[in-house]
Amino acid sequence: MSDKKIKGLEWQEKPLSDNERLKTDSNFLRGTILDDLKDDLTGGFKGDNFQLIRFHGMYEQDDRDIRAERLEEKLEPLKFMLLRCRLPGGIIKPYQWIEIDKFAREHTRYQSIRLTNRQTFQYHGVPKGKLQPMHRLLHSIGLDSIATAADMNRNVLCTSNPIESELHQQAYEFAKKISEHLLPRSRGYLDVWVDGKKVESSDDLLKIEDEPILGKTYLPRKFKTAVAIPPLNDVDVYANDLNFIAIQDENGQLCGFNVLVGGGLSFEHGNTKTYPNVAYSLGFVPLEHTLAAAEGVVKTQRDFGNRSDRKNARVRYTVQNMTLDGFRAEVERCMNIKFEPTRPYEFTERGDRIGWVKGIDNNWHLTLFIESVRITDKPEKPLMTGVLELAKVHKGDFRITANQNLIVANVAEQDKAQIEAIARQYGLIQEISKLRENAMSCVSLPTCPLAMAEAERVLPDFISELDKVLSKHNVADESIITRITGCPNGCGRAMLAEIGLVGKAIGRYNLHIGGDRAGLRISRLYKENITLQEIVNEIDQLVARWATERQTNEAFGDFVIRSNIIAPVVNAHIDFWDATKIIPTTII
């Protein structure tokens, strides 16, 4: 970490968090993980290794549904790992999917592939003894899980735009370049998981390894990046630490990016020093300076981000402490160029185009709605087998979207009928409401250790209840972006929803409303600590008013603000916790 100290960074006078010691002592992220892999007495990892595996894309979890039962039997919790693959832009080849499916069926507790809103897949329930075989499998098919968790740049998102195929390809290539450029240089991942090579001392490593961008202690906290192609904001570009908005020239070619920083949706119940936030614009950079801008933002966060209090360590808090102008100046110093003024752009929607769409290259793309985003086989819905059968015949690629759906991309005209027939045979094509189409949740129980309430498992039935409400008020064809997250950590991006539920306790949630369709506005707390049925009753009353009092084409989130049902969040660091402090301009 740099020894630079500037006004507003009082944290530098405080003790560092223990995570900083952990990273320093880790032998460039190797730790003693190899020793733990040989320990058959526990299904988990000990000491620092419990956290270090996160830098390799894994979390230790247990099945909370049976935790109490196992404790009564004097057994440790049923421990296993979550694996999150690194998949910039969400693109995966059919041959890779076939191998991923095989491992999930044979070696994971839940025999499922979970799609995430970070455009990748997760394995849940991987036993410790299968971790090295899993990583070696990924490596053999050109994949890995490096830096998909912990204090590094995580999986880079990119708009899944199947229509503008040329522009999407250009933006996707930059998403891949950004991901590769910001990866750790350490061979720790390969040494532990692929080669199985033990390194004894960090002294020798210092001679052969360096982290010129991330630094020896990496970043202060998680760091998320997205690339968006207007007018579609499917990646929720305002919700990330670093964001690139694609700008086209007069010929429709990608000419550069607007760069935004300081988005993020996590907060802590009752902790007014934490808040969700939409990103701020630094300005525009031409294509040739894209990687320099990414590196400059990362280095600024590396040097000035809070390493004392991890709850205030994301980029938005660094921007608040340095001021936006101060943050911009440091990024410009790092990249040795100035930002140009922000170029005009507009976002109009966030949802996926479910069903078939034709690209400008005449290829077809089929977007499949995956409810609860867990691809598994059930008697009435053998979705996992269905996707596997698609992978066996598909000649294009798959794209996991930031809305947790799956695109069968680049289907030739002559192959379209076969792809559709398979998808219909296995229940992958279905008639659903607009409300369900735009609903999303995090994983939550039973595997997430942070979960305070259900999310993934209650979302389908909750949406069914809201569908009844919309039908009752004759707005069944309308869309309201609805999201549930099991805790305030933000994984379900509920704070950018028109209706957002944040878990508070088992069976109880905080209800937030007032986000907008384009993902530009944070929602505000409306009712606290209430049940799902109470939430349905509240939404019933609000939808009744919306159906009769709204203006032409007025979205639900816009209506509740215009009608003064709820005050907008204007400057989250000032007014998220107290609507009486709303002021019209951002002061940071």
UniProtKB/Swiss-Prot annotation:
Keywords: 4Fe-4S, Amino-acid biosynthesis, Cysteine biosynthesis, Heme, Iron, Iron-sulfur, Metal-binding, NADP, Oxidoreductase
Cofactor(s), by name: siroheme; [4Fe-4S] cluster
GO biological process assignments: cysteine biosynthetic process; hydrogen sulfide biosynthetic process; sulfate assimilation
Functional pathway: Sulfur metabolism; hydrogen sulfide biosynthesis; hydrogen sulfide from sulfite (NADPH route): step 1/1
Superkingdom in the source lineage: Bacteria
GO cellular component: sulfite reductase complex (NADPH)
Function: Component of the sulfite reductase complex that catalyzes the 6-electron reduction of sulfite to sulfide. This is one of several activities required for the biosynthesis of L-cysteine from sulfate.
Assembly information from the UniProt record: Alpha(8)-beta(8). The alpha component is a flavoprotein, the beta component is a hemoprotein.
Protein name: Sulfite reductase [NADPH] hemoprotein beta-component
Gene that produces this protein: cysI
